[in-house]
Swiss-Prot record:
Gene: ldhD
Swiss-Prot/TrEMBL keywords: NAD, Oxidoreductase
Protein name listed in UniProt: D-lactate dehydrogenase
Residues annotated as binding NAD(+): 156-157, 176, 206-207, 233-235, 259
Superkingdom classification of source: Bacteria
InterPro entries, A to Z: D-isomer_2_OHA_DH_cat_dom, D-isomer_DH_CS, D-isomer_DH_CS1, D-isomer_DH_NAD-bd, NAD(P)-bd_dom_sf
Keyword Oxidoreductase set for record: yes
Transmembrane regions listed in the UniProt entry: none
């Protein structure tokens, strides 16, 4: 019987993974550990592996997988910047991802958390907790229909986000290297700077790559409309975090919401209750009154989890049986 290791198992995924195994006549072993130099030897007797990595995979894992006859790693996220695709290819390892598992879920997150900032909910909540129930100009908002929203990246998630904002009646600008002709309700601009210059809300939906690394830094924030709101449900490396904090502090941004953080791997998805966090930048984000932080959870719905579990396992089995899969990256 084919054997697949399901690394990075969350409690809510285990039953889904085992049920998939029964349906597909595959022996699935679940483990809460991640694939790493320390765990790769567990795969000696396995045919395939799926995992949910957040940090970089060590280089010595690839040749070990090759020596064990394993031909793939199925990543259970859309992001794949934790892998060295060229090194994997050198060792005959197919890397795959799950590019679309519930774009609507992430789009709903992006819009809902932006609306919290639009309606000044963090400020209002602090006032109410202090028993201040007055109406002040500082907590007055304006309708989204009177706003311009910039969508940076109009793939599945960005497109879904744009459609929600269109339902509010917002004016929508966008930038993508490959414009989507079906999104005829928005206006594409020739650059990110052009797309954001009049935007009240900026919503990021781009992958992590050389072109997007620290795309939003001080130089980019200099082109932002004063008082704009920034939402990042894409990848942490898209933003230069100290520059983001500075932009909020000096009023360039009214506020920001981030679901991803460049150095999140050691913290996000782990319980740090009653433990000391050494990352001063992360602490500054968390403690900032005008920055909302969530732990890479924009995708987190029952539909998305089911699709990620099955997407990873289906890709692993496809490579085992055929040598390739529809979602291969290298």
């Amino acid at each position: 019987m084919t054997k697949i290791m399901f690394f990075g198992t969350r409690d809510y995924e285990k039953e889904m993974a085992l049920n998939w195994g029964k349906k597909n006549n595959v022996e699935v072993t679940t483990s809460k550990e991640l694939l790493s130099s320390a765990t790769v030897d567990q795969l000696k007797d396995y045919d395939g592996v799926t995992t949910m990595q957040f940090g970089k995979l060590e280089n010595d894992v690839y040749p070990k997988l090759e020596s064990y006859g394993i031909k793939q790693i199925a990543q259970r996220t859309a992001g794949f910047d934790m892998y060295d695709l060229d090194l994997a290819k050198k060792h005959n390892i197919v890397i795959s991802n799950v590019p679309s598992y519930s774009p609507e879920t992430i789009a709903e997150y992006s819009v809902s958390i932006a609306l919290q900032l639009v309606r000044r909910f963090p400020d209002i909540e602090r006032r109410v907790q202090a028993h201040d129930f007055t109406w002040q100009a500082e907590i007055m908002s304006k309708p989204v229909k009177n706003m311009t929203v910039a969508i940076i990246g109009t793939g599945r998630i960005g497109a879904a986000t744009a459609k929600i904002y269109a339902g509010f009646g917002a004016t929508i600008t966008a930038y993508d290297a490959y414009p989507n002709k079906d999104l005829d309700f928005l206006t594409y601009k020739d650059s990110v700077k052009e797309a954001i210059k009049d935007a009240d809300i900026i919503s990021l939906h781009v992958p992590a790559n050389k072109e997007s690394y620290h795309l939003f830094d001080k130089a980019m924030f200099d082109h932002v409309k004063k008082g704009a709101i920034l939402v990042n449900a894409a990848r942490g490396a898209v933003i230069n975090t100290p520059d983001l904090i500075a932009a909020v502090n000096d009023g360039t941004l009214l506020g920001a919401a981030i679901d991803t953080y460049e150095n999140e791997a050691a913290y996000f998805t782990n319980d740090w209750t009653n433990k000391d966090i050494d990352d001063k930048t992360l602490l500054e984000l968390i403690e900032h009154e005008r920055i909302l932080v969530t732990p890479h959870i924009a995708f987190f719905s029952d539909e998305a989890v089911q699709n990620l579990v099955e997407g990873g396992l289906n890709a692993a089995l496809s490579v085992i049986n055929t040598g390739t899969c529809e979602t291969r990256l290298n």
